Amino acid sequence: MSNLINLNNIVYQVDKKYILKDVNCHINKNGILSILGPNGAGKTTLLKIMAGLIKPTSGSIKFNYKLPIGFVFQKPVLLNRSVEYNLIHALKYSIRPQIDQSKELVNHILNENKLSYLKDKPAKKISGGEQQLVSILRACIIKPEVLFFDEPTSNLDSEFKNTIEELILSASKKTKVIIVSQDQMMARKIADELLFLDRGTIRSEY
């Protein structure tokens, strides 16, 4: 079975400073990969390269996944419209044949996750934890082949962390999940594979 992503000799520099150096890894198509490491290790940069959001300075990448992908940022990026609108808007950019049923699909996913009370609320006025939940649902609703998470539980209380952990585990049954997290307990708990990055270099994989 071919790998989902192949990274060979990846280098990423900013103003001649190495953010990533000689990164080689081969990501399989199933389960959850957690990328761990200290602040400044290059984790988010590596995640964005894996997602095709930025290009490396040198090295080669082979992507064996199809668009769309889902990407959940550390700080939720939502439109200043209702939660329902944000989810429907995501479907407009999906290549999946589900647009005609978009409202029904949005209602279903909100009800399924006990978040129907958020449907008509402005996304910018709900709590930070609720915004992150909506961001995750927005990423999942397009049924991507890969879901990328950049510090999804940062600065959230334990209740929201637990809910997000459950969402990630649920999503991983249908799609590959790659997550960057400083929360080592959570990242290790849910991961099928771990990759440890330090000073821009992979130190271990297991």
Where are the regions that the model predicts?
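Helix-to-loop junction immediately C-terminal to a conserved catalytic motif
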Residues: A51
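Conserved ABC ATPase signature
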Residues: P122-I126, E130
